[in-house]
């Protein structure tokens, strides 16, 4: 059976001066889905604790919209057939991401770091780190607009302000976010810990 080539591969093989960008977990105002909502929502709800599966160690490389734009500008000035990874200069863990968001919003909470995935699921929960090699982009002259903590502020503030209206924020029953915001299960866990002490 013949293998079907992906659209980026087909574009690259034409020899035309087309640059294909491969970002990872995109963040920025208007991001869909806005993954950082799992922590922003907790702050808005004044949750006393943040639960993180795999002890928050999961790393799935983030990509700021501002960094994508910076790479597009460089690639457009030097047209050639190529495929470039696009990612932030750092690759924060889920724990680091939660801390960046809480700090920006002036919120403090207890960190409940769990070894399993029964609670504390989040969008960066991967067994093995996913980190993109951006050396080709850097060799082209690309300079990131900023690291994760610097660039994610735009999305955080956008979410706190209500996005672009009610429909731009995740619905409480959204299948992507609902498992990450199971407050009833978390409260039960915290209550059990208090009674066993």
Annotate the PLM regions:
Residues 1:
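N-terminal Rossmann-like NAD(P)+-binding domain of SDR-like oxidoreductases, especially those catalyzing
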Residues 5-30:
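Conserved beta-loop-beta element that borders a ligand/cofactor-binding pocket
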Residues 28, 52-58, 84-92, 124-125, ...:
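Glycine-rich Rossmann NAD(P)(H)-binding loop
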Residues 40-53, 107-112:
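A short C-terminal helix-loop "cap" of Rossmann-like NAD(P)-dependent dehydrogenase/epimerase domains
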